[in-house]
Amino acid sequence: MDALKPWHLYLLLCRNGSYYAGITNDLERRFQAHLRGTGARYTRANPPVQMLASHPYPDRASASRAECALKRLPRARKLAWLQAQPRTVHESQPADASITRV
């Protein structure tokens, strides 16, 4: 059944003001892992404050390619990517509550 789930590229805002981009096929589970400190090494050192946006992809390969492209962008271009995402993806709320969207 997991093979049918879309993959998502997501962008987190970290406590130090930096962004973290990653991919997952379960946004809520992955975000909670980052909050617990069991996600990525980067987010253990720089805990996330909120999930800013996500974008679905049909498979892991396309999500991974998009992640690599996003990570190569300068901060201003990452903001442009964020602003281009649909506003219905997530609603703003504190990181300790759930996934967020500004």
Swiss-Prot record:
Residues 5-80 form the GIY-YIG domain. InterPro entries: GIY-YIG_endonuc, GIY-YIG_endonuc_sf, UPF0213_domain. This is UPF0213 protein XAC3202. It holds the Pfam family GIY-YIG. It comes from the Bacteria. Belongs to the UPF0213 family. It comes from Xanthomonas axonopodis pv. citri (strain 306). CDD domains: GIY-YIG_UPF0213.
